Curated annotation (Swiss-Prot):
Gene: fumC
Residues flagged as site, Important for catalytic activity: 329
GO cellular component: cytoplasm
PANTHER family per record: ASPARTATEAMMONIA/ARGININOSUCCINATE/ADENYLOSUCCINATE LYASE (PTHR11444), FUMARATE HYDRATASE, MITOCHONDRIAL (PTHR11444:SF1)
Active site: 186, 316
Protein name: Fumarate hydratase class II
UniProt keyword list: Cytoplasm, Lyase, Tricarboxylic acid cycle
Amino acid sequence: MSVRIEHDTFGEIEVPADKYWGAQTERSKRNFPVGKERMPIEVVYGFAQLKRAAALANFDLGKLSEAKKDAIVYACDQILSGELDEHFPLVVWQTGSGTQSNMNVNEVVSYVANMYLKDHQIDESIHPNDDVNKSQSSNDTFPTAMHVALYQEVETKLEPALKLLRNTLKEKEDKFDSIIKIGRTHLQDATPIKLGQEISGWRYMLDRCEIMLSESKKHILNLAIGGTAVGTGINAHPEFGDKVAHYISENTGYPFVSSENKFHALTAHDEVVQLHGTLKALAGDLMKIANDVRWLASGPRAGLAEISIPENEPGSSIMPGKVNPTQCEMLTMVAVQVMGNDTVVGFASSQGNFELNVYKPVIMHNTLQSIYLLADGMETFNNNCAVGIEPIEENIDNYLNQSLMLVTALNPHIGYEKAAQIAKKAHKEGLTLKESAIQTGYVTEEQFEAWIKPEDMVDPH
């Protein structure tokens, strides 16, 4: 392997000649061969947005020449294009401030920017610390890149997937509004409900999650940049943070602002905890929806079988013809993982000692993973399951007509105790509810027909 020699304050080190990173990235690669979880590329793109904006801000403030500004902006745009992904090899499990990833970006930007200057025959050079990282510290850049990445992924990936599934459930809710089925509480028969009403509960869960997500993501718009090492802003111009936030907003289209309290921004990540709490709430709702779907689709002959779901693949390697609710199982596993991630994010956020929280990479990793899993999970569940849900009306009608809980409609006419006697007699003697009611003498056949109407029970008002 061909190498070149790079150096840092620790001395010289060999770096692969075809890679754009420098000495500090190479040391991190060697010092932290831990796990396979690479720093998400979205974080790198968040850094690129930041470094680009910082160059523009430093130029405005007279801290950087126009040539250096142009070179850094060019390098950052190259990163944002996705052309340089291979030059960001570091894992999540590194220093808790994310310093190595910050330097990885600084070194790659410096390398590409210097090529730009050379190509344009400009007699200047870019230093990763003195120029790319000017007016910055890893302590304020990593949380800034984290917020930029999280906000963008919620906007571009999670919210569209949430809307997609919500809209499908709304279509099913409207389509099945005339189908009356038995309701169930405590896993036992209850009073009737429309299939559309049942699905409306699922849909409304997603409506509420969409609102909660919209509210919680607003706090992610606050950026730590300008706080530098401990929140005081040492080595940065007083206007630097606001200018960087402005340029990030200009390039992304999102209204980022510089946090009004940088001490908080460096040592606490409660804004991410709140965001992930919403992800956990969404995971809980998806768990409930997926469980309901697979129970209602259980069978085909010895289960509830009130709905059918698409048959996407063989379900068993030993039982021919078996088809399993695999999309539901996928979504419930996603939900469990997100709930686990929430525990990590909450605990990691609590570990801000004095002026800095040093669990930033794991907070970032787990939150992004939750966003990816929920977004991909909802889209896949929607396309391969939800869109194909159909009622099995014969079974639905059979369960409804056999239910003893229709007796609830008699309460206002004969009282709770007599209605309970009718239900118990029917269950004990294997009678229909109508047969039991007439045999007790509490109601006539005409009264039973007038009072026991499932269509009235689902819309009592």
